[in-house]
Design a protein with these regions (language model features):
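A short SAM/SAH-binding and catalytic strip from SAM-dependent methyltransferases
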Residues: 127-140
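A short glycine-rich, Lys/Arg-flanked "PGG" loop and its adjoining helix->strand segment in the class I
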Residues: 141-153
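Conserved class I S-adenosyl-L-methionine
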Residues: 2-58, 72-76, 96, 156-190, 234-237, ...
Length: 286
């Protein structure tokens, strides 16, 4: 006899297993820079490095990259001279990041790890960064709280994201076009494009999933609710412009199915400094 399990009856452990499987599969096709030339890819890296130079200053810092994926942030921060630790649930993503780092002769500390339960002691990082991560976390408030735990007093957390474009509530835009695109991609690239996307059960259990209105605003609120100070969101104009250019170069089969938001934003927050430490704290100064 078949037993039906509702969305809320699927355990977090089972959901996390499905999420890991999804990212292991997606790792094979995750990097869109395969569709662009080195000129624009180099501009993207330089733009993000310029942002971090302004934010972090010239001091060598110990940085945790949560959800490192194929290593976009980890690699460029290591190239800037920082000590970088990257964690990800997906072993395949970690493997790809490690391969890229070796090709560039960079030393990264890469580990399989959960954004909600950082495998490090309290107050051991100067900075925590994440890029396109919070939307895919089952318990984002738990994750952000743990990021704050591993930060040193006065340290900063950065969450980079592109706020979702609200889809019109019609069948064509919400269902038909994405599924048509996945069909075309599957045929053209000889793979199962559906395997890279979350099923309905997972999507319903992700509080900050892009399908849910106001998910970006809730990210900011969670930073405040979890105790971060000086929380602010900043639009990254140059990174956004380059993102728009890259999307314009994407194959038509990808543009067919999705409305892309090119606008990169950074949510930042600081961990409070203990009163006795304030006079000697100079984080991010050149």
């Amino acid at each position: 006899m078949m037993t039906y399990m509702g969305n809320n009856q699927v355990s977090s452990e089972e959901l996390k297993r499905r999420i890991i499987n999804r990212w292991d599969e997606a790792s094979k096709y995750y990097d869109y820079d395969r569709f662009t030339d080195e000129d624009i890819n180099s501009k993207v890296r330089d733009t993000w490095k310029e942002f971090f130079n302004k934010e972090l200053g010239s001091e060598r810092l110990k940085i945790l990259d949560v959800g490192t994926g194929t290593g976009f942030l980890s690699i460029l921060l290591a190239e800037m001279g920082h000590e970088v630790v990257g964690i990800d649930l997906s072993e395949m993503m970690i493997s790809l990041c490690s391969k890229k780092a070796q090709e560039k002769d960079l030393q990264l500390d890469l580990r399989i790890g959960d954004a909600e339960s950082i495998p490090f002691e309290n107050e051991c990082f100067d900075v925590v960064v994440s890029r396109w991560v919070l939307w895919t976390v089952l318990h984002p408030e738990k994750a952000i709280t743990d990021w704050k735990r591993v930060l040193k007093p006065g340290g900063r957390a950065y969450a980079f994201d592109t706020p979702s474009v609200e889809r019109e509530a019609n069948t064509i835009d919400k269902y038909f076009r994405p599924n048509l695109a996945k069909l075309v991609i599957s045929i053209y690239e000889r793979r199962n494009a559906w395997s890279e996307y979350y099923d309905k059960v997972i999507r319903s259990r992700l509080p900050l999933n892009y399908d849910k209105k106001g998910s970006f605003d809730r990210q900011m609120k969670l930073f405040v609710d979890c105790g971060f100070m000086d929380v602010a969101a900043t639009k990254m104009d140059e990174a956004s412009a380059l993102s728009a250019e890259i999307w314009g170069r994407m194959p038509w089969r990808y543009q067919l199915g999705w409305t892309c938001n090119y606008e990169w934003y950074c949510i930042r927050g600081s961990k409070a400094v203990e009163p006795q430490e304030k006079d000697n704290h100079h984080f991010g100064e050149n």
